Design a protein with these regions (language model features):
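Gly/Pro-rich turn-and-neighbor structural signature
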Residues: 169-173, 186-187, 490-523, 534-540, ...
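N-terminal export/assembly segments and adjacent metallocofactor-ligating motifs
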Residues: 1-449, 457-468, 484-487, 539, ...
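A glycine-rich phosphate-binding loop feature that marks nucleotide/adenosyl-phosphate handling sites
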Residues: 181, 319-324, 506-507, 523-525, ...
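Short hydrophobic beta-strand segments
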Residues: 175-180, 242, 515-523, 688
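Acidic/polar loop patches that form or flank catalytic/metal-binding clefts of enzymes
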Residues: 61, 205, 310-318, 498-501, ...
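Conserved short loop/turn motifs at secondary-structure junctions
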Residues: 179-186, 246, 487-492, 522-529, ...
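Ordered core of a single globular domain
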Residues: 665-668, 673-682, 687-688
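Secondary-structure capping and boundary motifs in well-ordered enzyme cores
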Residues: 267, 274, 292, 478-481, ...
């Protein structure tokens, strides 16, 4: 009976209006009069679609969109997509801390009001402040101490405009530089500021490299900028490695592909010094010491080359290496300063008699043709990219001069004229090791003889793969003193050699059976280290040796700010004011800050910090100071730098006109001649 009475009481509570007033509050909380589609534009690559529920123009709540199209049959759906940062985005919109108005340093605002009271012209008012040492120090010393006051837009815009005009008149337009993060975050916002910079003659600073999101290994290796695969491709991989990429945190919308890939048979290795969010997804978590991923991969590559390229020549790997890498290219072996020999440059095609007259012969390279037993010049080098004859900038294994087929010979191990002891750098120990390398001798067009080997043979020697040649090669994997053996890696990585060997064999076997379905997920955890490019390239080697790049389920996947602009060309015309003039004034931000902030004063020569190549020739770039290299880069035209000259460039142009230079070409020639005669210098030569 009591149960029935309790039930009746409960029903009475449910239908009593007074007891259900809380429901009205709940309904009001989720009310909306429309739903709009949007995303959270906070420089996030995810770009997740969200349904934004709006009432009276106010965001009331948000819900993830669930209508992504399927990319292809067999792939899991894209949703769910979203993250904790996104779903709380409306908090930023309505936060009392959000800056909605211009703020100005109080000390500067007081000075500005005084100056405007005394000067009708805003430019004159600003000039009176900036040229008054006491006034200038007053607002500069207030920096970092708070004291910001809200002001109106007209005042803010007037100060900005007056300061820019004053700077241009006194010092020149290239004394003004503008910076904004990635344009893909907001193309219109970025373009408006960048266009202003270009139209007034200012410089636009780079962004991707400045905050260390650009993986320099990508342009160094492939000449592109983070053209990585779609994250759904993780599902195709049969072995995934995550290093320096905390996928659960930084790619939350995509991390479900990790879990789904494992259901599909993918094995996930995570290299992380701590048990990170992504480590919970791992089949194997390897706590590699911080900053030592490069040592891990170098030892892995030693195993891969030993077992999958030398002891067993895996057909797929060998074919891929011949077709898609520079391993078959011929490299000169040249005398070093100490009388020994060291690897030189790639042998230029133009140095041989048969190719002496080809266009851009200094920018075309050679392979050894296994069938004809002679050097041949494959298409696809830089010289073909800029040649007058089109259609040769490709990877077809054909001679660029006569069109004959090329069967690249990777190694001279079984067919050589001599074995020479080549000096190779051991940067870990700060010394050198001497190892035997098979070479052939060629006669150049001028009658000189030159010894050459293949890049592949040099790789084998550098990695210490014992192929029965004389020299300082390791006896086996357990040699702790020979660079790049599994035993050598232990003192850097903190991981036992048995784990590394097992990983390398799994990697190679997986790639062999799947034809390259091994992927490295990599990110800021590695990229923000000094020499990150070398850690990246060590991993890239493992991908190359096993034919993983360019394959579905394989490759290097760098996920830090790799957003791209879809309308890149038309957008650039607007943002860089190309509809008015070209070229634009663009400056790499790291150099700009390094020089102008006097960071260079706090550094010493390269050799005080780093192990550099031993016995390098007189033209080496591995000696000196970074600032010396920066000056050299500007003087030789490798890098732009602004401001260009100590003088106002407007005054320089006037002087050139007065000297009779009556066209832009003559002005440029006049300036170049004065630079050559040391009558002018670049501002980077005297940054203060």
């Amino acid at each position: 009976m009591s149960i029935i009475q309790d039930a009746i009481a409960w029903i009475r509570d449910e239908i009593t209006p007074q007891g259900r007033q809380w429901e009205e509050f709940y309904r009001n909380r989720w009310q909306h009069d429309k739903v709009v589609r949007s995303t959270h534009g906070v420089n996030c690559t995810g770009g997740c679609t969200w349904n934004i529920h709006v009432k009276d123009g106010i965001v009331t709540w948000e819900m993830q969109g669930l209508d992504y199209p399927l990319l292809e049959a067999g792939l899991p759906p894209y949703e769910p997509r979203g993250c904790q940062r996104g779903i709380s985005f409306s908090w930023y919109l309505y936060s009392p801390l959000r800056v909605k108005y211009p703020y100005i340093r109080g000390a500067l605002l007081d000075l500005w009001r005084e100056a405007r009271a005394n000067h009708a012209d805003p430019v004159a008012a600003w000039t009176s402040l900036v040229e008054n040492p006491a006034a200038r120090q007053r607002w500069q010393r207030a920096r970092g101490k708070g004291g910001l006051r809200r002001t109106d837009w007209n005042t803010a815009l007037e100060i900005i405009s007056a300061s820019m005009v004053s700077t241009i008149k006194k010092h020149g337009p290239d004394r003004i530089a503008g910076f904004s993060p990635i344009p893909a975050m907001s193309m219109i916002s970025f373009a408006s500021g960048a266009r202003l910079m270009q139209l007034i003659g200012g410089a636009s600073l780079s962004f991707y490299d400045w905050y260390c999101d650009l993986p320099t290994a990508s342009p160094e290796t492939w000449g592109e900028q983070t053209d990585v695969q779609e994250s759904a491709d993780w599902y195709h991989a049969k072995m995934l490695v995550s290093m320096g990429a905390n996928i659960g945190m930084t790619r939350t919308p995509d991390c479900h592909f990790l879990a789904e890939g494992r259901h599909n048979g993918t094995k996930l290795w995570v290299f992380s010094p701590d048990f990170s969010m992504v480590a919970k997804y791992a089949d194997e978590w390897v706590a590699v010491n911080t900053g030592q991923d490069g040592a891990w991969w170098m030892a892995v590559n030693h195993v891969l080359l030993t077992e999958f390229h030398h002891q067993k020549q895996t057909p797929y790997f060998m074919d891929y290496t011949k077709k898609f890498t520079d391993a078959p290219f011929l490299v000169e072996i040249k005398p070093a300063a100490n009388g020994r020999v060291r690897p030189g440059q790639l042998l230029r095609a133009g140095r041989l008699q048969q190719y002496a007259k080809v266009e851009h012969g200094e920018w075309k390279f050679l392979m050894w043709d296994e069938a004809d037993q002679k050097p041949k010049m494959p298409m696809g080098s830089s010289g073909d990219r800029w040649g007058t004859e089109k259609g040769k900038w490709n990877l077809l294994l054909k001679d660029g001069q006569d069109g004959s087929e090329i069967k690249p010979q990777l190694s001279f191990l079984e067919d050589h004229d001599a074995v020479v002891q080549v000096e190779l750098d051991d940067f870990g120990a700060g010394g050198v090791c001497t190892r035997g390398v098979p070479v052939k001798t060629l006669t150049t067009a001028n009658g000189k003889q030159v010894q050459v080997t293949t890049a592949y043979d040099l790789l084998m020697a550098q990695y210490g793969v014992n192929r029965g040649l004389p020299g300082e090669y390791p006896a086996d994997y357990n040699d702790p003193n020979a660079p790049y053996t599994p035993a050598w890696s232990e003192k850097y990585t903190g991981i036992g050699r048995d784990v590394l060997i097992r990983f390398a064999r799994e990697w190679g076997t997986t790639a062999e059976h799947t034809e390259g379905k091994c992927t490295i997920l990599i990110g800021a955890g590695v990229n923000h280290w000094y020499h990150a490019n070398l850690m990246y390239r060590a991993g890239i080697h493992a991908l190359m040796f096993c034919g993983c790049i360019g394959k579905n389920g394989g490759g290097l996947a760098h996920y830090v700010g790799q957003e791209k602009l879809a309308p890149a060309e038309p957008w650039a015309a607007i943002a860089q004011a190309k509809d008015w003039f070209s070229p634009s004034r663009l400056q790499n931000a790291p150099s700009w800050h390094y020089v102008h902030s006097d960071q260079w004063r706090y550094e010493k020569d390269f050799t005080d910090y780093h192990t550099v190549p031993q016995n390098a020739g007189p033209d080496t770039t591995a000696k000196g100071h970074t600032m010396d290299m920066q000056v050299r880069a500007v003087r030789q035209g490798w890098l732009p730098f602004y401001p260009q000259f100590p003088e106002n460039p407007l005054d320089v142009a006037k002087q050139a006109r007065a000297a009779g230079a009556d066209s832009p070409e003559k002005v440029a020639s006049w300036v170049a001649k004065r630079l050559q005669n040391k009558e002018m210098k670049f501002s980077v030569e005297d940054p203060d």
